[in-house]
């Protein structure tokens, strides 16, 4: 370009908008972040909830790499997971309440661990392992929540947690919501989402490059910018965040402080009967 060699992914705005195809239709996974509906919202095919906000899916849903269903993971996310899981400290969730076996109000806390996850014989995350909570407050988020019919939800708020790899330097949302199913074995699964700075995800994709990522980075850049639906810049008025949702699987684990004192108990044996079977409950109220 103008006799200079450069990586287009680093300066995508110098190239024209290719007007890539975008996902359309009735259904998409995600959460109703704003409590409203509208022409750009979806219906969750699993829960029946309407008003789903997931413009990230509108941008990515037509690319072959993302046109998959679980248990298959999108190629980019699969590579990132296999790279990070054995090198990046674990992300921790703690649920505290009067009686977690019944409906009621709870507190939900997210933290980053000091140590990395352990794998079980299936290659999944081992249940019943012990993690020391990183005392750095930047990866600590607290929410008021509720359990109803074994479904955990939270009141909206800000979420931030640090990663530690070239792919996931951090994950952050405003107006965060989640919907997790709490299972009898102590595990949880569901979705967390909110309004994510769209450039965070674009830069994550650009690290992979177009060849490995199997997407048109210039098209994704312009579509992220076009479909961003929150957090307008005070000067330009352009939205800087895009509605998104991420699938989460969590297994039971012990949380301790830097001195080894118990903070959160590991409740249940976990999925696939993997890891140490937890059959006793400590005095921790979790």
Model-predicted segments: where are they?
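Extracytosolic secretory-pathway proteins
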Residues: 1-286
